Amino acid sequence: MQNKIKVVFCGTPKIGADVLKALIEMNQVEIVLVISQPDKPIGRKKQIVHTPVKKLALENNLKVVQPNKIGEIYDDLAKLEFDFLITCAFGQFIPTKILKLAKIDSINFHGSLLPKLRGGAPIQYAIKNGDKKTGITIMQMVKQMDAGDYYVQESIDILDSDDSGSLFEKMGHLAYSMCKKYLVDIYNHKFELIKQNEDEVTFCKNISSEEEKINWNNTSLDIFNLIRSLSPSPISYTTINNQRYKIKSSKVIDLDNQNKNAIPGTILGINKQGIVVKTLDKALLILEIQKEGKKMILASNYYLNKLSDLKINDKFD
């Protein structure tokens, strides 16, 4: 290939940086511009931290811009010549007039097996739904969210041991390898686009703060999946006596007969493994817990260190 593939890349978190890393490593690619969300204050000290995409771009001497809305830089983009606009977890709506600036196509690395899980939180929802598989779809971007035809998709297994953190990591590796494997073939028009089956479309909006609260009237499996989907951030929570407790990890366990009629949310046991709580159908063993204002600890500390703020027969709201 004589001419380099010219790319404008849009992305923000680590999974976006994984795709950018692949592009940087490809000799066939020239990255014309990197676009990322504005830097935000992080943590208790509210320090301004570069997005992972911006950090990687600066380390590789790439030009980076961070508009509040990408439409603000339309005139600048229109002056550039580029073959692809490539996005992965950018986090902004991109107007159609910008999508049309790419000579060949505007494509997105979407974190699900489309048409399932269109929307902003596909990786979290795959876990929340209890799915056993998910994957990456390289798709055309169109005005309607995640509705474009796609070039290719690859799947990976979701293990019971996965949470959002580990699944994001695995999906990042998959997106990285797919970028290297397929971009040149897409450039050379070696793919036939595949239409999404509209009868199989599902959606996933961003998980709201209200949905982060555990409902103990749900099944153990549903609560287990919710906890995994929100770990390591923002972390699901429960309350008792107006006190909030975050729960980072858990395990589904069976009930003994004497506790089958207990009210969901009741603490049934505190032992060397953790804290046992009644759910709709079984019990949940809490493995990691954080009282508001304190550090995250192993729930077994309640037994080993005789912590007294949670007791057997207490009931979470």
UniProtKB/Swiss-Prot annotation:
PROSITE patterns found in the cross-reference section: GART
A molecular function GO annotation: methionyl-tRNA formyltransferase activity
Catalytic activity, EC: 2.1.2.9
CDD domains on file: FMT_core_Met-tRNA-FMT_N (cd08646), Met_tRNA_FMT_C (cd08704)
Residues reported in the UniProt entry to bind (6S)-5,6,7,8-tetrahydrofolate: 112-115
Catalyzed reactions per annotation: L-methionyl-tRNA(fMet) + (6R)-10-formyltetrahydrofolate = N-formyl-L-methionyl-tRNA(fMet) + (6S)-5,6,7,8-tetrahydrofolate + H(+)
Similarity section: Belongs to the Fmt family.
PANTHER family found in the cross-reference section: METHIONYL-TRNA FORMYLTRANSFERASE (PTHR11138), METHIONYL-TRNA FORMYLTRANSFERASE, MITOCHONDRIAL (PTHR11138:SF5)
Name the UniProt record assigns to this protein: Methionyl-tRNA formyltransferase
Gene designation: fmt
